[in-house]
Amino acid sequence: MSAAGLLAPAPAQAGAPPAPEYYPEEDEELESAEEDERSCRGRESDEDTEDASETDLAKHDEEDYVEMKEQMYQDKLASLKRQLQQLQEGTLQEYQKRMKKLDQQYKERIRNAELFLQLETEQVERNYIKEKKAAVKEFEDKKVELKENLIAELEEKKKMIENEKLTMELTGDSMEVKPIMTRKLRRRPNDPVPIPDKRRKPAPAQLNYLLTDEQIMEDLRTLNKLKSPKRPASPSSPEHLPATPAESPAQRFEARIEDGKLYYDKRWYHKSQAIYLESKDNQKLSCVISSVGANEIWVRKTSDSTKMRIYLGQLQRGLFVIRRRSAA
């Protein structure tokens, strides 16, 4: 059979259905579609395989992480237990380091406390010695001052007694009570009983002075001048006494004492103030006001520490003059 006979179509039989026509282009399209479908299935299979591999890898990594974390926890727990055991035994390095630091701080505080105690003890001893010396000095000063005050009081009393004696000698005749010469008559029966005369009072046993010594002496000298010349002068009379500045008229000064201070010549003076004391005989003394009384002041000489009493009357009449001076 030739090729033309093979390729030529067979003649159609009578009464049979007509055969379908064959197109080569359609076969190629079918084959291409099948290949595409197979390639798609292959790709899907590969993707599924990759997804499964990734899931397995993730599960494996998670297990490794959990295992690693557990291992770290166990290691850390073991380390803490080991440190706790060393701490209980006292061999932990950190514990020994901190204990050494605490011990140094303890020793430092003990040393500082001992030094502070020593310093305070020395300070207390110094204060004790200082206070003791001050107390002894104050006692000695008070003792000397008391002795001086007593001596001054005794001297004043002695002077007052001498003045009383001098006054009694000068006015002895006037002090004597002379009896009155009266003529006694017989009392008649109807006359009343005579009443004794009580107008004359007896002389006091002690003289109370309201004036200063200088004022008394000045009054006595005045009385002596007014006496009769028939009476002989006694050696203790004012004519035989040395003249004093009070005989001449003196300038009046304003002097008074208020609230424990002396107001003199428009100036105020207080206790422990340094002054100059000038007398009528032009004697100038450096003094310190020792005390201020009600009607007089006490001054202490800086040269020999003796004390003098100055009355307000003496300052007012100018028998003594007070001047200020520097405390240095």
Swiss-Prot record:
Residues 23-37, 45-54 have a biased composition (Acidic residues). There is a cross-link at K69, K178, K201 (Glycyl lysine isopeptide (Lys-Gly) (interchain with G-Cter in SUMO2)). The modification Phosphothreonine is found at T49, T244. Residues 56-65 have a biased composition (Basic and acidic residues). This is Sin3 histone deacetylase corepressor complex component SDS3. The modification N-acetylserine is found at S2. Residues 1-65, 226-252 are annotated as: Disordered. Its main location: nucleus. Polyubiquitinated. 'Lys-63'-polyubiquitinated SUDS3 positively regulates histone deacetylation. Regulated through deubiquitination by USP17L2/USP17 that cleaves 'Lys-63'-linked ubiquitin chains. Residues 1-16 have a biased composition (Low complexity). One of its GO terms (biological process) is chromatin remodeling. It comes from Pongo abelii (Sumatran orangutan). Regulatory protein which represses transcription and augments histone deacetylase activity of HDAC1. May have a potential role in tumor suppressor pathways through regulation of apoptosis. May function in the assembly and/or enzymatic activity of the mSin3A corepressor complex or in mediating interactions between the complex and other regulatory complexes. It is found in: Nucleus. Residues 66-171 form a coiled coil. GO terms for cellular component: nucleoplasm; nucleus. Belongs to the SDS3 family. The modification Phosphoserine is found at S32, S45, S53, S228, S234, S237. The C-terminus is involved in transcriptional repression by HDAC-independent mechanisms. Keywords: Acetylation, Apoptosis, Chromatin regulator, Coiled coil, Isopeptide bond, Nucleus, Phosphoprotein, Repressor, Transcription, Transcription regulation, Ubl conjugation. Interacts with HCFC1. Homodimer. Component of the SIN3 histone deacetylase (HDAC) corepressor complex. Interacts with SIN3A. Interaction with SIN3B enhances the interaction between SIN3B and HDAC1 to form a complex. Component of a mSin3A corepressor complex that contains SIN3A, SAP130, SUDS3/SAP45, ARID4B/SAP180, HDAC1 and HDAC2. Interacts with USP17L2; the interaction is direct. Interacts with FOXK2. Residues 188-226 are annotated as: Sin3 interaction domain (SID).
